[in-house]
Regions:
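Short glycine/proline- and aromatic-enriched beta-strand/turn motifs that initiate or cap beta-hairpins
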Residues: 17-92, 270-272
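Sec-dependent N-terminal signal peptides of Gram-negative exported proteins
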Residues: 1-22
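Short loop/turn motifs that connect adjacent beta-strands in outer-membrane beta-barrel proteins
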Residues: 26-39, 73-81, 93-95, 110-118, ...
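Residues on the lipid-exposed face of transmembrane beta-strands in outer-membrane beta-barrel proteins
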Residues: 44-48, 66-72, 84, 105-109, ...
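Outer-membrane pore/translocation modules
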Residues: 57, 80, 84-181, 238, ...
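A contiguous pocket-lining binding segment that forms or flanks enzyme active sites
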Residues: 167-205
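Glycine/small-residue-rich hydrophobic helix-like segments
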Residues: 204-256
């Protein structure tokens, strides 16, 4: 796993950009009143398809993702957040994707009892963003972005939340991403948790002309079963629909780069701490 790509523009940008995880690394249960110096999860799994912001690249791109999510509470309002993810492609992807490495670093801010904001800096190497940076814009396979995530738990529907995120990519590819979703996390039994999420993803000035706008709709259901202690197994299933912007991206690329109406399934082994 090579993180050397971090030490180029990041050193110059880190002063002015601090940021959050576009996929909401905001905790599933943010109401815990205790301050914790270290909490998070270590995860390894398998997915039938690789996903990038709701988009499914053409071909059967199976992946073996490995990730670490870390949070350190600084005080009752602020927490430091870190996320590392390596998306490994066991076989040769249909569109020649490189393994994807993602690093997120930032801060989370508690806004009252049931609302949170997170602001972070993300470095991404490889994957669909890296391919697009090289093939569509003639740059390196590394991109950098700043991101803001806002989440609000709904008092009138216990376990439900709404969430929105915006991300600006400022290196490799420049442009905006917006992700709006709603979902629920609930405990069914002592050892079984269930969650679902439904959302829409849009882009602005990220892809070449004609490829922006509504990118995808997605729906995902996840079960989390405690095997023992703090070790869980998490199967999931999701459905992705391709939007008008995604179809425009295929026309710009000149061939089918992303597909819609695709199921994604997988399973992960998770250690929570």
């Amino acid at each position: 796993m090579n993180y050397s790509f971090l030490f180029a523009p990041v050193a110059a940008q880190a002063v002015s950009f601090s940021v959050s995880l576009a996929e909401s690394r905001i905790p599933d249960h943010p109401a815990d009143p205790l301050l914790r110096p270290a909490s998070g999860s270590l995860k390894a799994g398998y997915s039938t398809r690789y996903e990038f912001r709701g988009l499914i690249p053409a071909g059967c791109n199976q992946t073996a993702p490995v990730s670490l999510d870390w949070r350190s509470d600084l005080n009752e309002h602020y927490s430091f957040i870190l996320a590392l993810k390596e998306e490994l492609f066991p076989g040769r992807p249909a569109i020649d994707l490189d393994d994807e490495t993602v690093v997120d670093l930032g801060f989370q801010r508690k806004l009252g009892k049931a609302a949170y904001a997170a602001f972070s800096l993300r470095a991404n190497d490889g994957g669909l963003a890296g391919l697009a940076s090289e093939r569509l814009f003639g740059n390196s396979s590394t991109t950098y972005e700043a991101s803001l995530v806002l989440r609000r738990d709904l008092d009138f529907l216990p376990g439900f939340y709404v969430q929105g995120s915006s991300a600006y990519s400022f290196y490799g590819i420049t442009g905006w991403w917006f992700d709006m979703c709603t979902g629920s996390d609930s405990r069914l039994t002592e050892n079984l948790y269930m969650g679902f999420k439904f959302g829409a993803v849009l882009s602005s000035s990220y892809w070449p002309s004609g490829g922006n706008g509504w990118q995808a709709l997605y729906f995902r259901v996840t079960a989390s079963y405690r095997l023992f202690g703090d070790v869980f197994v998490e199967p999931f299933a999701g459905l992705h629909w391709l939007g008008r912007g995604g179809h425009g991206l295929n026309r710009t690329y000149g061939e089918t780069l992303v597909k819609g109406n695709r199921w994604v399934t997988g399973v992960s082994l998770v250690y929570s701490f």
